Amino acid sequence: YLDEDDGHGVEIEYDEHIWTSPVNAKKLAGVLAEVLAQEDPAHAASYAENCASYQDKLTELDAEFREVVSHAKRRLVVFGDKFPLRYFFDEYGLEYRAAFSGCSTDTEPRAKTIAYLIDKVREEQIPAVYYLELSSPRVAEIIGEETGAEPLLFHSCHNVTRHQFDSGVTYLELMEQNVKNLKKGLS
């Protein structure tokens, strides 16, 4: 908690998931390319070329998210799950409510929290409630059953299934699905 002048504490939630923002992912790609070039100078030009191409794709992805947000009916998103997406939401000026703070190790939200989220979804007429990859969608489903909101996956790009790994799924592919699902929730 940080104390403010008015005497109220403000909780600061740290989130190590910096890659959830495509803008940050673009910076990370640049740093990785630089380090690889330093360690393997013979292939520095290849690293730089590949990085530039990938950064162009990340710029396009960022533009897609900005387009979705610019046409949104709302800025509030509800997660029936943990919330490792602070950098993403900060980047696009979105607000959220979640069943758990940050990446809590809790596995069951309090009944009061679920009731609050149900009320918020009803009050704001939110059409979708999200859950994360490799996580139980049960809380999102409960909220959906009570409100008519559609439970949808929002991928933090932190984990993939064995099948996704074996098939070579990429960050860009996972984030493209997020573009589609976010659009549904903000409409």
Predicted stretch roles:
Residues 1-187:
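Extracytoplasmic metal-acquisition and chelation regions
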